Amino acid sequence: MEVKGKETASVLCLSKYVDLSSEESHRYYLARRNGLQMLRDRGYEVSDEDINLSLHDFRTVYGERPDVDRLRISALHRSDSTKKVKIVFFGTSMVKVNAIRSVVADILSQETITGLILVLQNHVTNQALKAIELFSFKVEIFQITDLLVNITKHSLKPQHQVLNDEEKTTLLKKFSIEEKQLPRISKKDAIVRYYGLEKGQVVKVNYRGELTESHVAFRCVW
């Protein structure tokens, strides 16, 4: 019992030296960087300078306990300047309807957007979800833990390529099939959510492995 007491005391003593603010800023840093990369992969204009910002420089700019409002990201689409998306970070509190309405009102008072991505650290209420459905633009919800790692960079994840409308039409004609005959991939799939895909869009999946032959498959979002 005496040993356990000493161990507990040691843990409590060491906990004083754990910098929770550093952990917090690191989480925000990773989520923001991967959010920027996600936007670029969706075809939005994102600078190398923003993506390659170091953790040290991030903390210099935003501090050890970043203000979530300062972490917001706006980006225009490279091929369609009418498309503008915004990423908004929330703190650790439960996200209620008033918080959603306040954030959206603040954004729309300054700019016009066609898409909004919310990065949360807690649950969102049903009332808030219902309010989100009423907005005229697409709203996507990610937990901050979803963005701590870029899943497209994982060594075990096959490469995914999103087909445009012309490539999709060519594919269907080549194999003389209809869209509904393609193998499906769920809208809830992590890759589908990463690219923000909609029902009917098609992805080309390149499988490469040391134990299996390389092959290509096509999946239709359903």
UniProtKB/Swiss-Prot annotation:
Its main location: nucleus. One of its GO terms (cellular component) is RNA polymerase V complex. One of its GO terms (biological process) is DNA-templated transcription. It is found in: Nucleus. InterPro entries: Arch_Rpo5/euc_Rpb5, RNA_pol_Rpb5_N, RNA_pol_Rpb5_N_sf, RNA_pol_subH/Rpb5_C, RPB5-like_sf. Disruption phenotype: Partial loss of methylation and silencing of RdDM targets, probably due to the redundancy with NRPE5B. GO terms for molecular function: DNA binding; DNA-directed RNA polymerase activity. Keywords: Nucleus. It comes from the Eukaryota. Expressed in roots, leaves, siliques and seeds, and to a lower level, in flower buds and flowers. DNA-dependent RNA polymerase catalyzes the transcription of DNA into RNA using the four ribonucleoside triphosphates as substrates. Component of RNA polymerase V involved in RNA-directed DNA methylation-dependent (RdDM) silencing of endogenous repeated sequences, including transposable elements. Required for establishment of DNA methylation. Component of the RNA polymerase V complex. Belongs to the archaeal Rpo5/eukaryotic RPB5 RNA polymerase subunit family. This is DNA-directed RNA polymerase V subunit 5A. It comes from Arabidopsis thaliana (Mouse-ear cress). The lineage of its organism: Eukaryota, Viridiplantae, Streptophyta, Embryophyta, Tracheophyta.
